[in-house]
Each structure stands twice: as C-alpha cells, then as structure tokens.
A protein has these predicted regions:
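Amphipathic alpha-helical segments within well-ordered protein domains
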Residues: 17, 52-56, 94
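Helix-adjacent hinge/juxtasegments
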Residues: 56-84
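Short acidic, glycine/proline-enriched helix-loop-strand junctions
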Residues: 73-87, 99-100, 107, 131-148
C-alpha cells in the first residue's frame, strides 16, 4: 500500500487488537505496518466507534489493564492516531450496511464511510470484507495456517 503524507489510513478494530496483543497471529504485520506509517508521518484516522469496539474486545479477550493501556496509547497527544467523531457518517454507513454482505458489521461500514469521506481506500485492518468491498487492507499473517 503506497501512500502519500496527505493521504490518511483508517483504523479498524482488527489491526488495533492485533497491535495490542503480542500473542495475536497478526501482531507482527500490524506492528510492522504501524512502524512504517509512523516513520512516514502517516496519519491514522481512528473512528470513535472503532476505539470503543477495540477497548471492548481487548477488555474481554485480555483484561481491562490491557484495554486501558491500548486506549492510553491510541489517545496519547502527538500520536499518529487522530480520533474522529462518526455521527455525521452514520447514514452513509447504514446504506453500506444495507447493501453489503451479512458478514459485514456496522462498525466495518462506518470505517468504509470514513474512508470515503477522506477519499482513501486504505484501511489499517485485516478483515477480508474491506477488500471485497473495494478497499485495501493489511496483508494478514499466514503463520497460523503454517502452524496448524
């Protein structure tokens, strides 16, 4: 995914959970992508719904301490993550939700609507639904398949 400094990438829960969880099979690709984006001074747009979903998932899968640590890192002033309110994008997200596969969540549709708003197809996430809907996602690890 080649990007310019002006073009943001939109964060999805899948990559943020992988980034915060060292035992996640996509931790290394998420960390590598985040490092490249940071070195390029690339902004990562963080939809507020994605922040909430990420903290909920981390709190349930790991613990509240892990979730709070992730929230602190994502919301740290000066970080590459830019928190954005999503209320004004709900109608566009609901239209996508109506038109896309049952496997696509409303939060995924919000991520896509935010990407459309920022005129980007780049998603900082691993879900194949993004690719199927015409967006570019991070390349997931194949290590878990090789270990099976």
């Amino acid at each position: 995914m080649e990007r310019t400094a002006e073009q943001p990438i939109i964060a999805d829960t899948s990559a943020l959970v992988s980034l915060a969880t060292e035992t996640d099979h996509n931790h290394a690709p998420a960390k590598d992508a985040a490092t490249k984006l940071r070195e390029a001074n690339q902004p990562i747009i963080l939809p507020s719904d994605v922040l909430v979903e990420t903290i909920n998932v981390l709190g349930k899968r790991s613990c509240h301490e892990t979730a709070i640590k992730a929230a602190d890192a994502l919301l740290q002033p000066g970080s590459q993550f830019i928190l954005v309110e999503t209320t004004s994008h709900i109608q566009a997200a609901l239209k996508k939700f109506k038109d896309l596969s049952q496997a696509v969540s409303l939060t995924d549709c919000i991520v896509m609507a935010i990407a459309d708003h920022y005129n980007t197809k780049d998603i900082f996430g691993f879900d194949k639904q993004f690719e199927e809907a015409g967006y570019r996602r991070l390349e997931p690890s194949t290590e878990w398949k090789e270990a099976a």
